[in-house]
Design a protein with these regions (language model features):
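Autoinhibitory propeptides
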Residues: 1-31
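Serine endopeptidase catalytic core focused on the charge-relay Asp
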Residues: 29-178
Length: 178
């Protein structure tokens, strides 16, 4: 009853799901928030001026682009780019430091501040948020630095590779880590 039938001309449909499965994560938050020797989806990561977020996936530049085949990490724009900051000097720029774990988790779990060896990646590309128009993308990519990039996802037994793009379907199984 809280979501309108249409929103800005688009039909909406809310389907109630069983949320119990999200509570069965065999990896406690403390595990995801600690320092890791490889970059894997599901671990804590963030722009040096952000608190913390989750590394979403290991990705590569696409064919036909100058960066084709280049390895990147992918996460939300607000995690890797700090582009939502209202303070202009705090907004992200390419090459900014991405830490692993994220700065808030470094303090909370490791009980210290950010150090040079926390550098995990450098911000490569993002689409800045523009408050004057709808933002259609909440994603950013960064180039890994000292840490090896692992295609695995914490909490998943197998590595799944993207084979294409498809429209979502009601009842379609999706999984998230972190």
């Amino acid at each position: 009853n809280m979501v309108p039938v249409t929103l800005d001309g688009a039909y909406t449909d809310v389907v109630q799901i069983d949320v119990q499965s999200i509570l069965n994560d065999p990896f406690p938050p403390e595990f995801r928030q600690q320092a890791h020797s490889t970059l894997q989806a599901g671990i804590s990561i963030a722009h040096v001026k952000v608190t913390a977020g989750t590394l979403a996936a290991a990705v590569r530049g696409v064919k036909g682009r100058p960066d084709a085949g280049t390895q990147y990490i992918l996460s939300n724009n607000h995690v890797l780019s700090n582009s939502v900051s209202v303070i202009a000097s705090d907004r992200a720029k390419e090459g900014d430091t991405i830490t692993q774990p994220g700065p808030a988790d470094i303090e909370r779990v490791l009980h210290r501040g950010v150090e040079p060896n926390d550098l995990a990646a450098r911000l490569a590309r993002f689409i800045p948020f523009d408050p004057s128009r709808p933002n259609k993308v909440d994603a950013a990519i960064a180039t890994p630095t000292r840490l090896a990039l692992d295609g695995a996802t914490i909490g998943f037994e197998e590595i799944n590779y993207l084979e294409g793009v498809a429209d979502p379907e009601v009842g379609q199984v999706v999984r998230k880590s972190g």
